[in-house]
Amino acid sequence: MSYYTLPPIDPIIMSLGPISIRWYGLMYVIGFFATYFLVRQQIQRHQFTQLEKNFDNLNTVLILCVILGGRLGYVVFYNLSYYLQHPLEILATWHGGMSFHGACIALILGGLIFCKIKKIDFWATADVYVATIPIGLGLGRIGNLINGELYGRVTEQPWGIIFPNGGPLPRHASQLYESLLEGLILFIILWSLRNRPWKRNSLTPHGTILSLFLCLYGLFRIIIENFRQPDPQLGFIVAHITMGQLLSGAMILCGLTLWFWRIHQKKRATAL
């Protein structure tokens, strides 16, 4: 059987002196801009003046959270022993190594602290933002595909792809699977439900979209990890379970706990 061979693609689009513009970085930038404009649209629609006054400052904080949290998450979750021996490599983000789970933790903590200081409704803010996050996730996986990294396990399926750095055998294009599930499909679901928390339903209080995001992303990631090649420095953590699946399972538990807690809070507030 003949399989498609992914040609080697230069990860650098262009260089301007010492500055290199990379495909992966470009995907991040497009994701940030998409989030910026869609969130601003929602702020104006729902007249969320608390957030509107602090919008640009919060965006700056969240961008830093993505970069710092994503990098530190990779260091801690995926290669801690290496970075303890080579601490300066933690700063070398251009060598690759970002974790969405780390970025997610940093985004929630950073957003929570900012909203508390500025006296903004955190749960409403989180719902507005997370409905757009799958755009960046989907684009990021396209960047991984272009870089020929994070490829899937060996397969005999006719849609297998031979990757430049993946050896001679065809593999699952797990980057495309993730881009579809964690990107397009997750975005369609969250975006279609984005207005529910504003309708004062006791089953969909503010925080519902965040809860749903945690649950669905966790579920989709667990599914895709069955096709994705485990990180070589870690392999399987327990039996055939990867680090990504363990972290995603924790996300699902957090999402369910948060949703039930927010419903309980909403019912108590209504009773009063």
Curated annotation (Swiss-Prot):
MF terms (GO), sorted A to Z: phosphatidylglycerol-prolipoprotein diacylglyceryl transferase activity
Pathway(s) served: Protein modification; lipoprotein biosynthesis (diacylglyceryl transfer)
GO biological process: lipoprotein biosynthetic process
Membrane association type: Multi-pass membrane protein
One annotated Gene Ontology cellular component of this protein: plasma membrane
Residues spanning the signal sequence: none
Family, similarity comment: Belongs to the Lgt family.
Role, per record: Catalyzes the transfer of the diacylglyceryl group from phosphatidylglycerol to the sulfhydryl group of the N-terminal cysteine of a prolipoprotein, the first step in the formation of mature lipoproteins.
Listed name of the protein: Phosphatidylglycerol--prolipoprotein diacylglyceryl transferase
Species the sequence originates in: Desulfotalea psychrophila (strain LSv54 / DSM 12343)
